[in-house]
């Protein structure tokens, strides 16, 4: 005779997962409407839907269409993509390092991107003068340099940590810490050599912002982050096996070295594109995956897509707070994520310490 309680026990996790993903989808929608509707010109959700459905063709909606389609909608979409990319990267790094307190910055993307951006901000115009070229530098050079700097830094760490075809995540972690310190020192030298305008630009870049978001930025960021979001769930099975250890995962048929390379590459692309689009934003990649582990467990095939949803919603919500706290001015979004993320990180660290003590 079949045990009905067995079927119910199997169904309960599925119901929980469906409820969590439905809740996250609703959260993303609600936060997006909030972001598009709140600002110097408040716009009701009904008018937002009218503008989106009519594409700005109705003259009565001309002002709202201008605000929504040209300013707030690209900003919201960019925030969703960058937040999703950072959170998914954090989940990948935590799975790869088998440490729930790991962060995407461990592979050097943020350090390399930040240093490259600082070089362009401080030295870009001087290099043009030195070579007798007309200036100023096009703005597109800055995010392009940040993206390339992040990829180069990650490639350097990968080469340092790889010997005889095997990549040591411990070596990569230590090399990443060294790279972060070196990058910080070199950025400090650039800050010392900068003028007032460059110093403001450096400060704003290092703390992150979604200000100035355009459809051009969205179009440049989407081809980098969206393929990563599509690809990462396929790494879920391998990351689940990697929790047992590299040798055990290999004996289970997981191509461990290929998995490491894929995870590092995807993190480099997603974080590099995010830093290029919005500057350096911390704690999203750390807090979101760890929080979701408490809600839906460590199964990466669920954790990775859930991280994308919650990461996007969290960053857009932080952007809303950054716009409102000192309106009509705007806080760098990195300040908001740090103010929220740092206490949460300490709480997670203390909770983990208590668990290990038990």
Where are the model-predicted features located?
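Alpha-helical transmembrane segments in inner-membrane proteins
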Residues: 2-358
